[in-house]
From Swiss-Prot:
Keywords, alphabetical: Chloroplast, mRNA processing, Plastid, RNA-binding, tRNA processing
HAMAP family: MatK
Function as written in the Swiss-Prot or TrEMBL entry: Usually encoded in the trnK tRNA gene intron. Probably assists in splicing its own and other chloroplast group II introns.
Organism taxonomic ancestry: Eukaryota, Viridiplantae, Streptophyta, Embryophyta, Tracheophyta
Subcellular location: Plastid, Chloroplast
Record's GO cellular component terms: chloroplast
GO terms for MF: RNA binding
Official protein name in the record: Maturase K
Predominant subcellular localization, coarse grouping: plastid
GO BP: any one term: RNA splicing
Family: Belongs to the intron maturase 2 family. MatK subfamily.
Length: 502
């Protein structure tokens, strides 16, 4: 694949016309087959793994039968786990899917890299917490936020049309269409949500399809937003009231849109910032409520014309920063007006003025965390700690380590919230739940568990992370100082389990 990528950099025509022959390269399926064996080694018996040899000739026949569309339902359907033949056939079908994913990923990576090279100011950041400093810096200058849930009920033909824009290999597209129609159940809301939250073993192909679909949306949407800044003011002609007309029109510009016969009008002084993670996007705008409603209308029009998707109105909600809350990445996002007193000293006088700004206040959903802990049997519905009976068969070190990791992950993820002090109530619940679990295991009481010689580990376990993080901040900064961790790459599992009813 590395050699194939180097050849593609010299001549980009390969990714349009020569993808299908890659399916008949043995090294591609050797990697895919080894990956499947490593993934299934812990779940399948040894005798099946030893007898499940790999034949490249079978893969070639399988690809031809898929293109003929006479065996794809059996090959990519649900196989009987009790039959060895179905297991063997399922292994080959997974190898074909792995090979298809590898070919698409390499081609997609080169195309996206070529696209990003021409996007000035466009940054793709892996860390989740890096989004919040951007919001603190840019969003307070806006007064409205469009909270968007990207449509994910994707029809296979829409994906085929999307790939057809940058792939010209007809046999490859025929093979891709056959596989997509048999995998159409993987594009349901439930499966895509699982793939986005916690990518599993068999979610690599659906996750790639989702990323390519989002990339295609943003490849049209982001340049459209950029033109709001680069477009020139509207040219006016000779009018009798030219002065008044100039005063009205000098802050307005227009640009043509290919998908519509109308022209979209925007305020030239408006601020537009775009942030996305997973299926949630935020567009911050500065303007009137009417302009924001027009933005939502054109967004619906964009999805319908480019991707033939009918998006419901509830998927794009308009929030006023000074009044509404927004739920994003496990936080309640609120902007609070903050007044700053500015004093300017002149030669003969001292001027004092108030500067009013918006301040980002991310709030940790403590109530939702308590409900999740109650669901997982760490406490009851009122927040009273209870013992975790399913962990009593573990060793003391394993029990302490599990409770410790839960608290560390929570504390790291919500270290930037303004209600950080409320997190120590969660720590208290986990602390007592851990003590009750150890007491239940040893048939003792909480007091005896804490007074045992080994209780020092229990005492230090939940406090070491806070002491480590705040050692350099406790003397010079306030305890309410927000800390964003740049090494967090995934949403906390607790944040994904919350059900927010808007």
């Amino acid at each position: 694949m590395d050699e194939f990528q180097r050849d593609g950099k010299k001549n980009r025509s390969w990714q349009q016309c020569f993808l299908y022959p890659l399916f008949f390269r043995e090294d591609l399926y050797a990697i895919a087959h080894d990956h499947n064996l490593d993934r299934s080694s812990s779940s399948e018996p040894t005798e099946i793994l030893n007898s499940n040899y790999f034949s490249f000739l079978t893969v070639k026949r399988l690809i031809r039968r898929i293109r003929q569309q006479n065996d794809s339902i059996v090959l990519f359907g649900i196989c009987d786990p009790n039959q060895f033949i179905d297991r063997n056939r399922n292994s080959y079908s997974e190898s074909v899917l792995e090979g298809l994913t590898v070919v698409l990923e390499v081609s997609f990576a080169m195309r996206s890299k070529h696209f990003l090279e021409g996007m000035d100011g466009w940054k793709s950041i892996r860390s989740i917490h890096s989004i919040f400093p951007l919001m603190e810096d840019k969003f307070p200058h806006s007064n409205y936020i469009s909270d968007i849930r990207v449509p994910y009920s994707i029809h296979p033909e829409i994906l085929v049309r999307t790939f057809r824009r940058w792939i010209r290999d007809a046999p490859f597209l025929d093979l891709l269409r056959s596989i997509l129609h048999e995998w159409r159940n993987s594009f349901s809301a439930e499966n895509l949500q699982k793939a986005l939250v916690a990518p599993g073993e068999n979610m690599r192909f659906p996750l790639f399809l989702w990323n390519s679909y989002i990339y295609e949306c943003e490849s049209f949407l982001v340049p459209l937003l950029k033109r709001f800044y680069t477009s020139r003011s509207l040219v006016y002609g000779s009018f009798p009231d030219r002065t008044d007309f100039d005063r009205k029109i000098k802050h307005i510009f227009t640009f043509p849109v290919k998908i519509s016969t109308k022209r979209i009008w925007w305020m030239k002084d408006s601020f537009i910032h775009y942030v996305r993670y997973g299926e949630r996007s935020l567009i911050a705008l500065k303007g009137t409520h009417l302009q924001v409603k027009k933005c939502r209308y054109h967004l619906f029009h964009f999805w319908q014309c480019y991707f033939h998707l009918w998006s419901q109105s509830y998927r794009v909600s308009i929030l006023e920063l000074s009044r509404n809350y927004s739920y994003f990445l496990g936080f309640f996002i609120r902007f609070k007006m903050k007044s700053l007193v500015v004093r300017t000293k002149m030669i003969d006088s001292l001027l004092t003025t108030d500067l009013i700004t918006n301040e980002l206040n991310p709030i940790a959903p403590i109530r939702s965390i308590l409900l999740f802990l109650a669901k997982e049997r760490f406490c009851d519905i009122s927040g009273r700690p209870i013992s975790r009976l399913s962990w009593t068969s573990l060793s003391d070190d394993d029990i302490l380590d599990r409770f410790d990791r839960i608290w560390i992950n929570l504390f790291h993820y919500y270290s930037g919230s303004i209600n950080k002090d409320s997190l120590y109530h969660i720590k208290y619940i986990l602390l007592l739940s851990c003590a009750k679990t150890l007491a239940c295991k040893h048939k003792s009481t909480i007091r005896l568990v804490r007074e045992e010689p080994g209780s020092e580990l229990f005492t230090k376990s939940f406090s070491k992370e806070r002491e480590f993080i705040y050692s350099s901040f406790s003397k010079t900064r306030s305890q309410r100082e927000r800390i964003w961790n740049s090494d967090i790459l995934q949403i906390n599992p607790l944040a994904n389990s919350y059900t927010i009813n808007k």
